[in-house]
Every structure is written in C-alpha cells, then in structure tokens.
Amino acid sequence: MIHVAIIAGGKGERFWPFSTRENPKQLLKIASDKTMLEETLDRVADFVPLEQTVIVTGENIRKQILERHPSLKESNILAEPFGKNTCLAVGFAAIHLHKKDPNGVMIVLSADHYIKPKERLIDILRFGAAIAERDDVLITLGINPTRPETGYGYIELGEQYDSFDGLISFRVKQFKEKPNRTLAQQYYIGRMHMWNSGMFIWSAKSILNAISRCKPEMYKLLTDYAETIGTPGEANARLELFEKAEGVSIDVGVLEEANNVVVIKADLIWDDIGSWLALERISPKDKDNNVSIGDTILHESFEISTVNSGDGILATLGVSDLVIVKTNSVVLVAHKTRVNDIKSLLARMKDDPRYDQYL
C-alpha cells in the first residue's frame, strides 16, 4: 500500500512577521487562497486516500491544524514534542507506517512547496512508488535548475537506473551542498546536476534499514519507541525519543552516506517557498515588476514585494528593491539583498522579552 507523510514542522522564520511560532507558514495562505498544508494535501488527494496520509508536525500547532483543516482526524497527525530536524521526522513517520503496514511504500512531501502541475506530480509519484515497491532503493525527486541558484542543495546524476513513459531515474553520484555563485553557474550550464527538492519515495523497510546503517543510535531509539505505540507509555517514550535522538537532516544523516539512492528527473514547476523572495517567482507582477498582496497602493515604486495582511492600507512612494510586510502588530521593511537574513533580526529580538509576543 502507498502512504504519504507530509513534513509540516519548522517555524518558517524567514517568512516573519507573517509566519510566527504559533502560526507558522504551513498554516498560512501564501501561494493561493488555501493554506500551504491544504495545497499539499490537495496535490495527492486523487492518488493516496486521506486515511493513508499522516502529517508530521509540532505538538504546539496540532490543534490549529485540525481546526483549520476539518477533513483531518487525530489519526492523520503525528505530533512531535519539539522539532529535531528531518531525519528523525522521517524515521518517526516510517516506524509508525512500518508497524501498520510492514510492506508499505512511503512518499515524503514538504508542506511548504509550490508545485505545478498536479497531474504530472502524480505521474512521477506513481513511477517512483512502483520502483520503491520493487527495489531496495531510496528515491529523491530532482528538479531541473532554471537558474544558477545558490540557496539549494544539488544532486549529481550517475548512470541511468530506470525509465517509463518519458520519466527517467538515475543513480545518484553525489549530493552537493549549497554552492557558491561560480559553482551554481557550472551546475546550471552542465545539466548533470539537479536541485534537491526534499521530496522522497521509499518503502518503510528501506528507509528504516538505511537509518539502522547510517544512524544506529537513532534506529535503536526508534525501535524502542515502536514497542510502546498504542500503549499507555507511548507519550513518555515519544518524549524520550526526541530528547535523545540526534538532530540532523535526512540528507546529511542518511542519503549522503547511502549507496542505494536514486533520483527521478521531475519535470515540474517547483519552488520551496523558502523566503519572501519566492513571491517574485510564483506571483504575478505589475508593469513595474512589483508583487502586491493585500490592500496596497504602490506609486513610483519598482521591483518591490509588498504583503498587507493587517487592517488599513500599505502605501509606498519612490522606493525600489524592498520587501515590505505589514500585519496588525508588525511592519517589516527589508532590502531584497538582506531578506534571507531575517533570522539574525529575530535572534536579536529573542534577546529582549519585550518582543516575545511578536515572534
């Protein structure tokens, strides 16, 4: 059987002040009139039924997720007591799935991606699921670069692995960390590197075996926890799991070490919606190359992105190359070249208790 695990943790700090600790970006309407999580659920609804879908998220937003998405039930939520990066999030979902369906295939999606068209995504997932059911491999979806991007990790293609109906998979030769501008340009021109999308397909058995090889301590914690699932001791065991397990990404912790990784060339329109700069790539622009969301008036302003989610209007005059975000309690004004440094601003705010209510 095919299952979906949607990773919906994280604080979305680079979307502050729209995204906050108690209202992170996966619960916000950024790319459409639906929340990011709702968009993700809709993408796979015609392929995998909701009862075979779980959302891995923080306990602190479990209630909000259920309230804003009435179709979801408690059984759809796997709540982490606190975030510990994606290796544990994936392992947490995999151990639950394996207990329920030992031969199950697991599709891992992120709740903060922009993906079009939905139909092509389902074709790709179906192709990958067929491979994962047949072979002991770990599959990642690679995106053809559309620009020399320094903010993404890359995957170097090896020999062809499989193909079907125009879709092709390759052995992964090597994972590459986020490159500098020169390397990114080489990857873009060379066409042998793909963006690492953070979407994966594997059997629960295959990923747990990989964790056991690459992160044996984490695997032992996961299997100890699995013994308590459905018992009165589960909550305490889950807390112990998250307290003791290493905080590492699935890419660094497992995929970069594994020798059975395959990448599918995913011919999709894709963006990871990682920061306010993503709005320029997914939103319509006016004649002055501005992006405007909410009640705004932009006069003699160029190359700016504005978001007004609060009361009143947001007006600009004679400015350029800015990101301006207004809520009912905060206004952020940042130059586009610095908008990815929002975390440094938040770090300063965290040092002063006066600002805690705005985080």
Q: Residue locations for each model-derived region?
A:
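Short coil/turn connectors at secondary-structure junctions
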Residues: 1-2, 50-51, 73-74, 101-104, ...
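Conserved N-terminal catalytic core of the sugar/cofactor nucleotidyltransferase
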Residues: 1-6, 14-17, 21, 29-110, ...
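Short beta-strand segments
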Residues: 7-8, 56, 107-110, 140-144, ...
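Residue-level signal for inorganic ion chemistry
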Residues: 37, 93, 112, 155, ...
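Short histidine/acidic/glycine/proline-rich micro-motifs that form metal-
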Residues: 113-115, 145, 270
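Conserved core of the sugar-phosphate nucleotidyltransferase
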Residues: 118-232, 236-241, 262, 335-336
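Left-handed beta-helix
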Residues: 204-359
